[in-house]
């Protein structure tokens, strides 16, 4: 997470720094991205950067968290549209999310993220790390989501298990997306419709089960 000094910056300067980070991590994968390029694009001294962030990894994960805010709002909207049907909401949200990630404004950035980021890092991006601030934000997000779920449409009767189900769904989503980018990187591109079918199939398994 950024240091307190970052949050005391004027909004224009914070946005400029985030835009510079997006530009650099879109240009190159994490390992090849450069703090020097970020500060040059943002127009700030190197010393100032380290007053705001610990290192390149710190700004990388905060950038993803910042971008994820808008993506995450979509799940709430789809769940409301589905009248609290969790699986239907997840299905519509993930279908929409795939389009945004693969063909949207930040498509090149997400390609770098999923191709070059290991699974542990991907999980951290989705669920947050052990730092209290991340943990509290994840709790806040779930506190908005859980009341929208119609419990009459699922057999799970407690919040802990619902959260676990959502994490299972998103873990599979990220694995499928990572596989898509991995194939794309080796010139064996998988049609996006096939990726959507894979995600929908797993959601069907979660909804209906697989045992006869």
Predicted regions mapped to residue ranges:
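Alpha-helical structural segments
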Residues: 20-23, 27, 41, 58-81, ...
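Amphipathic alpha-helical packing segments from all-alpha helical-bundle domains
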Residues: 84, 88, 111, 120-156, ...
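Amphipathic alpha-helical segments that line or abut small-molecule/effector binding pockets
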Residues: 84-107, 167, 196, 200-207
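Helix-turn-helix
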Residues: 16, 27-58, 62, 66
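C-terminal peripheral helix-coil segments that are non-catalytic and often amphipathic
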Residues: 143, 147, 151, 167, ...
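Amphipathic alpha-helical segments used for helix-helix packing
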Residues: 92, 100-128, 132, 140-143, ...
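N-terminal intrinsically disordered/low-complexity leader segments
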Residues: 1-9
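Short, leucine-enriched amphipathic alpha-helices that occur as contiguous helical runs
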Residues: 10, 14-22, 56
């Amino acid at each position: 997470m950024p240091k307190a000094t970052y949050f005391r910056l004027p909004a224009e300067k914070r946005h400029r720094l985030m835009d510079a980070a997006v530009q650099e991590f879109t240009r190159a994968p994490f390992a090849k991205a450069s703090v020097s390029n970020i500060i040059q694009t943002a127009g700030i001294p190197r010393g100032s950067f380290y007053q705001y962030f610990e290192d390149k990894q710190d700004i990388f994960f905060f950038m993803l968290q910042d971008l994820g805010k808008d993506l995450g709002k979509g799940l709430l909207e789809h769940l409301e549209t589905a009248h609290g049907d969790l699986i239907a909401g997840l299905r519509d949200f993930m279908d929409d999310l795939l389009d945004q990630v693969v063909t949207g404004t930040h498509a090149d950035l997400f390609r770098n993220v999923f191709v070059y980021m290991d699974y542990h890092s991907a999980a951290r991006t989705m669920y947050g790390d052990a730092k209290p601030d991340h943990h509290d934000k994840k709790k806040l997000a779930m506190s908005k989501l859980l009341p929208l779920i119609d419990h009459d449409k699922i057999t799970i009767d407690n919040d802990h298990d619902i959260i676990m189900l959502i994490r299972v769904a998103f873990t599979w989503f990220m694995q499928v997306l990572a596989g898509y980018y991995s194939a794309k990187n080796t010139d064996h591109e998988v049609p996006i419709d096939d990726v959507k079918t894979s995600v929908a199939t797993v959601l069907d398994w979660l909804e209906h089960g697989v045992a006869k």
